Amino acid sequence: CSTARVMEEIYKILRSGASALTMDTLYHSSLLAHLAPEIAGHLDAHGHDLASSPLGNRLTALDRLTSSGRIWTNGVLLAVLFSDIVPVSAHPPGGKNPPSDDRLLHDAAGILDPISRRMNFSRLNKEQLVRILTSQRKFANPAKKPPQALQAICRKEYFRDALDFFEIACLASGISTDDVAIWREVAVNLPRPGVQRRGVRVRRKGEARPAEPKQAENPAPSGETAPAKKKRRRGPRRRPRTDTAE
């Protein structure tokens, strides 16, 4: 069976609303070791039973939200599977000497490269997965962030996928989803970039000033109005000759 076909089946399982039960069955039948050996190996190494593991909790949360009608991108589904294998997502915000975003992206890509090649992730799905996992630390404690910082994150192209996974992770860990509600409210009320509330265009940094309107030549003195231009008087319209030569 081709790797593309295997990935299609995995995505179907994760979107079925019964992914926790199905993946647990695959794990105990040793089929998961053939479909996704990295995941099965991680469970074996940590002595986890899938149902009670962090992965099992995420799958249960995923099924709960799927049953309510939620739809997921492939990037979110991959994040549910591989979050434990990419530990960069666990770095706490504001910790001692936190790694830079570039370092997180580099580390995550290095871990996922061999996995993505073997399982034949598309380039887009791999990039989505890396962005989702490495951005998770930014979603903690939104109430303590300035509005400008919240809006900047909401404008990122990966924001919605990353927030979807953040919600799944919160439910899986038994954490309140109040922070998720704050983020969604900010996103709904996000002002259009470069526009004030009154609709006045805001000049962005580095943007050239608009050209000043040209002054009319020989303007009228202050307090006076310029004389109106005289309309050219047109004579009577000439009728075409209709007579013929005799």
Task: Report residues per predicted region.
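Glycine- and charge-enriched loop/helix tracts that form the active or gating conduit
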Residues: 1-96, 150
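Charged/polar, low-hydrophobicity segments characteristic of intrinsically disordered regions
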Residues: 1-17, 26, 109-133, 195-206, ...
